[in-house]
Amino acid sequence: MKYDVGISNAIIVSSHNGYEPFIGSIGVKETRITCVMHGEIEKEECEIWIDGTGKILMPGLVNGHCHGDMTLARGLGDDMTLLEQNHAFADTGWFYTLINDEDRFYSRQLTYCEALLSGTTFIMENMYWGLGKESVRAMKEVGIRGALAEDIRIDFMRPDEFVSGEFLDEYKKQCEEAGLIPVIGGISEEDYETKRLKRIRDIAGQKGMMITCHLAENTWRREIVQQRYQTSAIDYLYHNNLLDENVIGSHVVYATGEEIHQLAQSNAKVVNTPLCEMKICDGIAPIPEMVQNGIRVCLGTDGAMWNNSNDIFREMKGMSLIHTMNSGIRSLDTKTILDMATVNGAMCFDLEKDY
């Protein structure tokens, strides 16, 4: 057969032609799309032929920031800010003492299934607690592509106790054998310390891994850095050579014009989670200004604790509406937001050839 799978008569929407929709077909051979065309693919050419009439066919969505461990906690953080949640759930270590590794395994799998059912085909898992090989198995069994961010700390409540180099080597090997991308989970602003951050940067460089971290997320974390270092988190990282193309900053709600330039100059990546930012009252990120400065912004959902959903389509709508209201009707056009959900996310993980 010419194609393993053929989909005919679908409404095709893709960045390759500026999202100009057309009725057409695609052919897939050995997991790769090898043909995109106007008109039909004949049934006889395909092992499996699917009639896409009335359906939209577009690239899979990318969720660049998610905490699958938190899906079991959906709804428990409603009507609370992140700081209030920190206080409310500190006594259980963010539910650590209430759930076991099996619970976390299935919480992640539920997250990945929800993501797939809403069109997401790549997801970044930001782990609070490592599950070793089970982290890889949870994602591989569901069949979603993704990146796994292993926290650099043995326990995220103890910022100076790092996992070993041998552990990271084995973890990276397990991820790559499963077709997943290994990432190092960094630290948040309340744990900033120059030697600690440079140590994380050096480990990531030695292992050939990207770093993801919560960055400029809210006012209380911003104030911690301001009081400790008399500057902002972004400026602090920039001037200590801790921002580069291997850093993925999540949220980035509080960024001045100068800090946006610093992000752009360093080629750091940004993943914004607009519904999370609204739900826990973090604020409105200056996304239009980031786009204007050439920063490739991606989308994420965060964990269900801070969103109640794993649906990137909802994030696209939220991104559009909040900035239309805040910055004007054409501050972010539809094509730009589609890029955030697809090709920008792919570029974040060096997968642009797949999009």
Q: Positions of the model-derived regions?
A:
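Alpha-helical scaffold segments that flank or form the walls of functional sites
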Residues: 74-144, 165-177
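Active-site gating loops and adjacent loop-to-helix segments of metal-dependent hydrolytic enzymes
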Residues: 72-105, 147-150, 156-157, 219-244, ...
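Acidic, glycine-enriched loop/beta-strand segments at the rims
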Residues: 13-25, 280-281, 287, 346-355
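Metal-coordinating catalytic core of metallo-dependent amide/deamination hydrolases
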Residues: 134-253
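His/Asp/Glu-enriched, well-ordered alpha-helical/loop segment
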Residues: 239-246, 288-355
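Histidine/acidic-residue-rich catalytic or RNA/ligand-binding cores of hydrolases
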Residues: 219-231, 259-264, 281-290, 307-323
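N-terminal metal-binding scaffold of metallo-dependent hydrolase/deaminase domains
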Residues: 1-44, 55-56
